[in-house]
């Protein structure tokens, strides 16, 4: 039954996209009650087959990665190289509110699916596109993944690691999900405009820009070369040793975060068991942490932190109201009481008989309640259903399948 409290009830999204970033935006709309129809080639979205690189068994019946990006959607297969396949797509666009894509612009132009062409045919349509590097400039047509466009080109991998070592190990989706949520926000705004004015719009987000926005504070600070540090840095070179992680006795890292150093100084020294340093004018003002004194404070904290376990520091810092968190592993998160209490995770029962934890999208709406978490569709699972809803007869569908204009999923 349709939940009319869902903000996107009655909205139709055509998703011409693969991998993660754009589908993540589509998932946001699907969770919000929109009908999101994902169009794939006969080979399917490559994300269906990435399990080995993630340390999972390859199974289409239990595909946690694909479910994260494509739950609650419908999936059809169209041959967009055929005239009939293109015709079906345009019939869908005529009734759609949003076209969501991660195709590169030159490919869209080649297929007559670029914004300038479509806005003449469908003036109310919102055109949403994820790119690697933006719409302009010498690299606008380069292929873009979050490993390359977000982490590397966007300034993450070149700065956020210990000086003298190597860039951090990156994992799939971290940059894509940020860009996808940015795009979802833009899509919602453009949809509101289209619904109130009758005029669609083009919404674009790039992976490179998403990373730059996330790092914006430090990118801007890098202009002041005579005042700041040039990253990458060593851990003990931080200008504020109260915003660093420290190793505990049992080899966990404990992250503290006290940007107003002066305010927290006495409290933190007391919590650390260094009451002798409370009020010490050498260290109690951040403006005094020059000429090596920041490193001295770092060393003091480091020496104290290894004297107790993470659980001991957990109790001490909670009692002292120190902003901190234990650096958790993914395995830790799967057992995290706070995550389960807030429905950040969902237990999916798969046809394989296994029950797996899946991560929910990080936006909740009180009145709508938690969205259903329906397993992502198999390749071409909804081709017949969607075409019948469009008015195609069984005979016409059979002919389209015979001519390879579409693909229909066969029941096993």
UniProtKB/Swiss-Prot annotation:
Component of the phenyllactate dehydratase complex FldABC that is involved in the fermentation of L-phenylalanine via a Stickland reaction. This complex catalyzes the reversible syn-dehydration of (R)-phenyllactate to (E)-cinnamate in two steps, a CoA-transfer from cinnamoyl-CoA to phenyllactate, catalyzed by FldA, followed by the dehydration of phenyllactyl-CoA to cinnamoyl-CoA, catalyzed by FldB and FldC. In vitro, FldA can use 3-phenylpropanoate as a better CoA-acceptor than phenyllactate. Optimum temperature is 50 degrees Celsius. Pathway: Amino-acid degradation; L-phenylalanine degradation. It holds the Pfam family CoA_transf_3. CoA binds at residue 102. GO terms for biological process: L-phenylalanine catabolic process; L-phenylalanine metabolic process. InterPro entries: CoA-transferase_III, CoA-Trfase_fam_III, CoA-Trfase_III_dom3_sf, CoA-Trfase_III_dom_1_sf. Belongs to the CoA-transferase III family. Its EC number is 2.8.3.17. Gene3D superfamilies: Crotonobetainyl-coa:carnitine coa-transferase, domain 1, formyl-coa transferase, domain 3. It comes from Clostridium sporogenes. Optimum pH is between 7 and 8. It is an enzyme of class 2 (transferase). Keywords: Transferase. GO terms for molecular function: cinnamoyl-CoA:phenyllactate CoA-transferase activity. The gene is fldA. It catalyses: (E)-cinnamoyl-CoA + (R)-3-phenyllactate = (R)-3-phenyllactoyl-CoA + (E)-cinnamate. Signal peptide: none annotated. This is Cinnamoyl-CoA:phenyllactate CoA-transferase. The active site is at residue 176. Homodimer. Part of the heterotrimeric phenyllactate dehydratase complex FldABC, composed of (R)-phenyllactate CoA-transferase (FldA) and a heterodimeric (R)-phenyllactyl-CoA dehydratase (FldB and FldC).
């Amino acid at each position: 039954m349709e939940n009319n409290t869902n903000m996107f009830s009655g909205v139709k999204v055509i998703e011409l996209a693969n991998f993660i970033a754009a589908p993540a935006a589509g998932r946001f709309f699907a969770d919000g009650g929109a009908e999101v129809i994902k169009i794939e080639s006969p080979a399917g979205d490559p994300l269906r087959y990435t399990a080995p690189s993630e340390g999972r068994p390859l199974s289409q019946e239990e595909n946690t990665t694909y479910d994260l990006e494509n739950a609650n959607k419908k999936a059809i297969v169209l041959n967009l190289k055929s005239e009939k396949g293109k015709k079906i797509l345009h019939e869908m666009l005529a009734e759609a509110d949003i076209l969501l894509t991660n195709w590169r612009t030159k490919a869209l132009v080649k297929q007559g699916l670029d914004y300038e062409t479509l806005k003449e045919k469908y003036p109310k349509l919102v055109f949403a596109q994820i790119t690697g590097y933006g719409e302009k400039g010498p690299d606008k047509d380069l292929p873009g993944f979050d490993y390359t466009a977000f982490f590397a080109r966007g300034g993450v991998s070149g700065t956020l690691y210990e000086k003298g070592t190597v860039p951090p190990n990156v994992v799939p989706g971290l940059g894509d999900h940020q860009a996808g949520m940015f795009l979802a926000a833009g899509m919602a705004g453009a949809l509101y405009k289209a619904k109130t004015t009758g005029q669609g719009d083009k919404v674009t987000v790039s992976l490179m820009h998403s990373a730059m926005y996330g790092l914006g504070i430090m990118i801007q600070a890098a202009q002041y070369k005579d005042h700041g540090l040039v990253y990458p840095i060593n851990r003990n070179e931080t200008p504020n040793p109260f915003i660093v992680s420290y190793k505990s006795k049992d080899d966990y890292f404990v992250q503290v975060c006290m940007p107003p150093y002066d305010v927290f100084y006495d409290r933190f020294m007391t919590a650390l068991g260094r009451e002798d340093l409370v009020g010490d004018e050498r260290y109690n003002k951040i403006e005094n942490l020059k000429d090596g004194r920041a490193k001295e404070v770092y060393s003091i904290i480091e020496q104290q932190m290894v004297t107790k376990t993470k659980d001991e520091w957990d109790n001490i810092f909670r009692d002292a109201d120190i902003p901190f968190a234990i650096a958790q592993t993914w395995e830790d998160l799967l057992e995290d009481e706070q995550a389960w209490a807030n429905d950040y995770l969902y237990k999916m029962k798969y046809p394989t008989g296994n029950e797996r934890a899946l991560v929910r999208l990080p936006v909740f709406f009180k009145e709508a309640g938690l969205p259903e978490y329906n397993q992502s569709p198999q390749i071409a699972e909804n081709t017949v259903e969607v075409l019948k809803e469009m008015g195609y007869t069984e005979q016409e569908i059979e002919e389209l399948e015979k001519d390879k204009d579409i693909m229909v999923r066969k029941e096993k």
